[in-house]
Amino acid sequence: MLLCSCAVRGTASNDAKPAAGDVTDSNAAPYEVPAFRDSVFNEDEATAFGSGEIDLSQLEDGIIGVKAQSDTRLKMQIVCGEDKYNYDLPNDGSATFFPLNMGNGTYTFRLMEQVGDSKYACIGSEDRDVTLKDEFQPYLRPNQMVNYNKSSDCIKKVKELDASCTTDADIAAAVYDYMVKNIQYDTEKAATVQNGYLPSPDETLKTGKGICFDYASLAAAMLRSEGIPCKLITGYVGEETYHAWNSFYVESEGWITVEIRAKADEWQRVDITFAAGGMPAGEIQNDSEYTTRFTY
């Protein structure tokens, strides 16, 4: 799995001063948060899949569930067209959820079992035509990389943050502001993190520190739970720095910080890790520096 080895650039620590959302009407109604979208493994809908089961009942919602048991390592491979994602899969029978993040098309789902040091054999395969309800579905619910549920502490925290928000842009600003001020970059963790690491939004919230992968996962969890589509993206900043950041979509225009204004009905890239490290907004907003490799 992916390893984020970015380093925070800039000289400040947590001294960035983003503004709250651009609330101009004190009499505006509070933002109405839509129903919580969960990822649920439907036992009645699941079918045999190699040494486990696969739930394909939520394809239009942009998510699948898989669980399997094995004495060896397992991987889940998802292919659509020329794109391919490989994930580690727990071998203890616990359900894990994966996004259908390659748009509409014919998907191939493969369960892979380790047969050598770096060799895997396919022990289960399913093909399905996928038509999503809309492009936002995969980025509105939990998955392996953005792992949370309705009872998660990070979801309780964002409920506190949204109390005075009247638009989705206000909520995005509140989450951005909270994370920049309260989550510190963990340089020790960045130097020792192992390949295959999975972020825990609640752990990041609890410890108040993390690497770029942690920042991006926590932000995505908070925003998704509020009905705001949010991608967790990994790739390169410049030519050598492997990094993680977010892209979110709001229906209302509004200030995210004093220098960043989100446009309505457009995807907006944000890099909270670098913002927390004091990097100037002009550098963070330079899209030419960012190259996407994977999206979750």
Question: What annotation goes with each model-predicted range?
Answer:
Residues 171-175, 208-223:
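Active-site nucleophilic cysteine motif
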Residues 214-296:
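Hydrophobic/aromatic-rich core segments of domains that either
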Residues 144-207, 256, 265, 270-278, ...:
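Secondary-structure boundary elements
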Residues 2-167, 255-258, 287, 291-296:
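N-terminal accessory/pre-domain segments preceding catalytic cores
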Residues 52-54, 188-194, 212-213, 217:
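Short N-terminal helix-initiation segments at or just after the protein's N-terminus
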Residues 190, 198, 209, 232-239:
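Catalytic cysteine-centered active-site loop
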